[in-house]
């Protein structure tokens, strides 16, 4: 039995294009270096002696920068191509991190954090377009899952190394993070050919193609999908913003115990998502899986109100929210990939990224204000209700647009048509 499970787990990785593995490796290096953001609030309050309100305002600028960066990244990707946008985003992000350690004043820090977030977020739409271009329809969802594995693994590693570096001195954190970004850019240059990724259309052809394809900002079905995606992200992101505070204040847990339980999320996603996606992909509509994931989100928050004890409720929460994430995120990304193509693909990816950027601003505000006014129990029930409303929205969307496809323009390159460097 274990041998069969192992073979199925291994088979889920077979057939994924080599370029997707390269992109995953580049993203893993980049994510492993995402140490400054993991510790930025502590750095602002402990090292720069900002009060908690000032630190909160700085993070609002971070969210605003991410929103602008996602929009700009989508536009730039369609105009310049995904390769230069990724490369220069990584390089400039590394330089910006080195500059950031020289900033100590509040308003200067707000501007620097805005710029850092903007530059960093420009990378995401370009990276998503690259994954879409290199993967085939048969491997697309698994390619997304493989990419997400690198994100989860990187976010697991980054806080560990970040904590060690911060204990040696905060400058170490900025230097290593900045140089890691630049190294990821060099890795991109070494593994993948910039010539192969260049746009294949002339300006005249591009203008003609733009006239023939639908802008995502006029695609009402897609805008409805983006709104629902933002709502489900607000539900999910309480995992990062309010649940750890609840474990600290409500359960009186130590940071070590909170970190250990939270790490179970990344471990489950790393272990289970790829083989699960391999078994499920193509058997049902993507939005059916997304709706099931939302049911699991609701179960996760309900766990805190069940009379089953602290440890069991926390484990049930993590298991449910992790499996919910595995159903929601890969299949919603695949829905976007299937709906977008050609000269506007970057804009579609940028708008999808913006949904999470907006949620990243709204989620902590929504969660903390509900807690302050009515307490944690009220928040859990409101999140369950929000998950239910979002489920209904996706049900309506799926019934009105069962195929999920609007734009039929073929991509500029196929997975097999793009050679690697060297």
Per-range role (PLM):
Residues 69-81, 272-285:
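Helix-to-loop junctions at the C-terminal end of transmembrane segments
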Residues 114-151:
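Cytoplasmic helix-loop-helix junction between adjacent transmembrane helices
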Residues 101-113, 305-317:
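Helix-loop junctions at membrane interfaces in 12-TM secondary transporters
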Residues 84-98, 288-302:
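Structural signature of the two symmetry-related core transmembrane helices
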Residues 174-189, 380-395:
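Symmetry-related core transmembrane helices of the 12-TM Major Facilitator Superfamily/SLC fold
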Residues 35, 63-71, 155-156, 266-274, ...:
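Residue-level signature of mid-helix packing/kink "hotspots" within the transmembrane helices
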Residues 13-63, 223-228, 232-261:
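Helix-loop boundary and gating motifs at the non-cytosolic
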Residues 1-17, 193-227, 416-422:
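Juxtamembrane intracellular "pre-TM" segments in multi-pass secondary transporters
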């Amino acid at each position: 039995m274990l041998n069969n499970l192992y073979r199925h787990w291994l088979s889920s990785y077979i057939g994924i294009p080599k370029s997707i593995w390269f992109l995953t490796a580049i993203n893993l290096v980049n994510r492993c270096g995402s140490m400054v953001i993991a510790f930025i609030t502590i750095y602002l309050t402990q090292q720069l002696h900002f009060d908690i309100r000032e630190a909160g305002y700085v993070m609002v600028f971070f969210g605003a920068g991410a929103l602008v960066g996602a929009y700009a990244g989508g536009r730039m990707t369609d105009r310049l191509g995904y390769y230069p946008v990724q490369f220069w985003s990584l390089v400039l992000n590394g330089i910006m991190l080195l500059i950031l350690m020289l900033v100590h004043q509040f308003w200067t820090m707000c501007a620097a954090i805005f710029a850092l977030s903007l530059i960093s977020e420009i990378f995401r739409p370009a990276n998503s377009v690259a994954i879409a271009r290199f993967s085939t329809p048969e491997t697309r969802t698994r390619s997304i899952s493989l990419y997400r594995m690198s994100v989860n693994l990187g976010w697991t590693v980054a806080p560990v190394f970040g904590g060690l570096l911060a204990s040696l001195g905060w400058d170490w954190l900025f230097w290593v993070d900045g140089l890691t970004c630049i190294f990821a850019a060099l890795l991109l240059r070494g593994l993948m050919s910039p010539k192969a990724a260049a746009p294949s259309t002339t300006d005249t052809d591009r203008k003609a193609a733009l006239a023939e394809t639908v802008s995502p900002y006029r695609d009402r079905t897609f805008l409805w999908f983006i709104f629902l995606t933002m709502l489900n992200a607000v539900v999910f992101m309480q995992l990062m913003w309010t649940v750890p505070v609840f474990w600290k204040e409500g359960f009186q847990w130590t940071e070590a115990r909170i970190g250990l339980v939270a790490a179970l999320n990344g471990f489950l996603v790393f272990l289970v998502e790829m083989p699960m996606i391999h078994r499920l992909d193509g058997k049902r509509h993507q939005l059916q899986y997304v709706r099931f994931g939302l049911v699991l989100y609701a179960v996760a928050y309900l766990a805190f109100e069940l009379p089953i004890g602290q440890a069991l409720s926390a484990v049930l929460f993590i298991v449910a929210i992790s499996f919910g994430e595995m159903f929601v995120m890969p299949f919603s990304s695949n829905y976007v990939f299937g709906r977008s193509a050609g000269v506007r693909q970057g804009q579609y990816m940028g708008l999808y990224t913006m949904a999470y950027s907006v949620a990243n601003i709204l989620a902590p505000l929504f969660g903390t204000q509900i807690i302050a006014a009515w307490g944690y129990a009220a928040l859990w029930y409101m999140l369950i209700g929000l998950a239910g409303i979002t489920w209904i929205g996706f049900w309506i969307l799926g019934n009105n647009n069962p195929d999920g496809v609007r734009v039929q323009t073929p991509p500029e390159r196929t997975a097999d048509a793009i050679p690697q460097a060297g």
